[in-house]
Amino acid sequence: MSTSINIDWLANEGQKLAECRHDNPLGVLGPQQIENKWALRVWMPEADAVNLLLKDGKKKLTNPNHPWIFETSLEENPGSSYQISVERAGISHTQNDPWAFRHEWMGEIDRHLFAEGNHHHIWRRMGAHQTKLDLVEGVMFCLWAPNARSVSVIGDMNSWDGRHHPMQKRLGGIWELFIPHIKKGDLYKYEIRSQEGHCYEKADPYGFQHEVRPAQSSIVSTLDSYKWKDQKWMTQRDKTDQLNKPISVYEMHLGSWMHSSNKTPYIEKDGSTREPVPAADLKPETRFLTYPELTEKLIPYVKARGFTHIELMPISEHPFDGSWGYQVTGWYAPTSRYGTPDEFRAFVDTCHSEGIGVILDWVPGHFPKDEHGLAFFDGKHLYEHADPRIGEHKEWGTLIFNYSRNEVRNFLVANLVYWFEQFHIDGIRVDAVASMLYKDYLRPEGEWIPNEDGGNENFEAVNFLQQANHVLFQHFPGALSIAEESTTWSGVTKPTDMGGLGFNLKWNMGWMHDMLDYFEIDPWFRQFHQNNVTFSICYNYTENFMLSLSHDEVVHGKSHLLHKMPGDDWKKYANTRALLAYMWTHPGKKTLFMGMEFGQRQEWNVWDDLQWELLEHDPHKGIQLLIDDLNCLYKSQPALWKDDFNEYGFQWIDCKDNTNSVISFMRRESSTGEWLVVVANFTPETHANYKVGVPVSGYYAEIFNTDAKKYGGSNTGNLGGKYSTEWNIHEYENALELSLPPLSVLILKYRKNKK
């Protein structure tokens, strides 16, 4: 069948395959036409015998040219669905031949869009996909590794031996291989050989599921098996202007909200028990709650508190618990710590059925150096810059994405679309945006490279963020895109077509720092720091702001919110209630980290759960009830949210009484003309007969008082409300004469008469 030249060539090709140096196995293996006949070559390392199965028997394949290349000649093309029997060590099995399938999975249009950075559904091509080719079921593997000499699929199917399943290199640095009979749940990785011959075992960058840490393999998973029930929610969401709605977010970390005991494992639907995932090495008796358990426990809790959204700290797969999820290795996979992708889908589905939106922390700013991740992926700096002055966060020990590379940008932008489309999430919060925008972020002089204009702005990152937000709102007009941006970069929430970054909300870090600094001051000295309270209004309408008291403020020795407050316990509780009420009445959407809603005392610890036992004590119950009532009031009063980003929505009554540390203002709603009066007393003294100017005479009902007894206060107040009197003050002709409780916030609503 072969000439001597062909024999030498085939022996050489076999040697390259055996040494994992081959990038074109389809040029050697499977059906090969030679003049007017066909050669069938099967690659089967360490096999003793291989037979081609025919309708009327079988035909033995021989290996005269290389011990692992079994071949025969045929009169006709056998197609792709032929089967072979393989014998190894006395054991025989039947299978299809992977190299019979010559289909090109990534088409020309796919490659073109990917190379441009514009393939928004590239995850439909990349990764491991269960599919059927020529009536044969299996998995198509597809990977981008343009600098690799060779790539193999390794896993349970071949005892993790890279010699068995070399992939075919296509145009654009794409590698493909269809492996028959692989099924959902099978483990796999890619074995990548660099041009220098170094070997790297990598998890699938587009893997839809990964093993629970510390294991690192990817898992074959399905995309479209879950049956969603939230069509009404999704339709309504994308018809709604999210900024014209009340948004009150419960920020939380799934793994440290609440733990369970290993003695009470999760029971599957079939009655079996699930292997528990220990929550921490120091507490081996505790385990993480599963997605189904969180569905049962967390969602009713958040609904009872009245929050409109849950914000989950990163749940993309990550190897190190201590990173809080911010060092991602599995961008396309919900972490397996808590269960399966479909169980997370069911969690989101249930949130929607209970009227709760889901926001994910998304981390496109950096990635870890773990060997199985994206770092030095194909023997070159593929996803990151080679120069550490632009490619590394030394302080964080992580690498920075190369946003100038189209395929890298595509990886991230498509990832955004993936989470919204595949998991029906409602929003993202982009972490550490400032670290992306500035080339000198946390870098001393001489350790960063200026841009082409000589400045410190990272134009590539700006372009990436603009593209990401543009694509997001193009596909999902009702989405939330929230920036954690800690500088004064202009136009963070301005649309991209106006030169902005395109987010629709930005965390107000200035308000947060000013208010925490203010409340940590002894109340008797707050009179010298009134500007901390009032300054945020000066810039409030430069961006669409969200007020946040986040996880970052209750770690690393900063103390939890309650323990930031000065004074004895009574003052700590009162200060906490006053700060929360001021936050809910200040313009801007709201985000509150878990534990703050009931006065957690200890700093947040990712390896522990919240101090739920505190709810056995009335002051902590009172703070929780305060949050319940604030959220209820907030959602019921459009003046507190409808004109958050319109100057009409806020009007100072008086911000100059620093002697008494008292401020007063109105929140107004433009469509109905309704308004609320808010008065805050940030000293521990009761101010009796305190006059506050109001625009209209009449009765003002006291609809909220942080000093109410049910919240743990002294129950000082105004007997449910006050009639105004004629009194010129604060540029108004009418005034309310109020009793201001210590360390309190009052909310009053105008009514023409008491009834």
UniProtKB/Swiss-Prot annotation:
The keyword Transferase applies. The active site is at residues 431, 484. GO terms for cellular component: cytosol. It catalyses: Transfers a segment of a (1->4)-alpha-D-glucan chain to a primary hydroxy group in a similar glucan chain. SMART domains: Aamy (SM00642). It holds the Pfam family GlgB_N. Keywords: Carbohydrate metabolism, Glycogen biosynthesis, Glycogen metabolism, Glycosyltransferase, Transferase. Pathway: Glycan biosynthesis; glycogen biosynthesis. InterPro entries: A-amylase/branching_C, Branching_enzy, GlgB, GlgB_N, GlgB_N_E_set_prok, Glyco_hydro_13_cat_dom, Glyco_hydro_13_N, Glyco_hydro_b. Its EC number is 2.4.1.18. One of its GO terms (molecular function) is hydrolase activity, hydrolyzing O-glycosyl compounds. One of its GO terms (biological process) is glycogen biosynthetic process. It is an enzyme of class 2 (transferase). NCBIfam families: branching_enzym, PRK05402.1, PRK12313.1. Belongs to the glycosyl hydrolase 13 family. GlgB subfamily. Catalyzes the formation of the alpha-1,6-glucosidic linkages in glycogen by scission of a 1,4-alpha-linked oligosaccharide from growing alpha-1,4-glucan chains and the subsequent attachment of the oligosaccharide to the alpha-1,6 position. Monomer. This is 1,4-alpha-glucan branching enzyme GlgB. It comes from Prochlorococcus marinus (strain SARG / CCMP1375 / SS120).
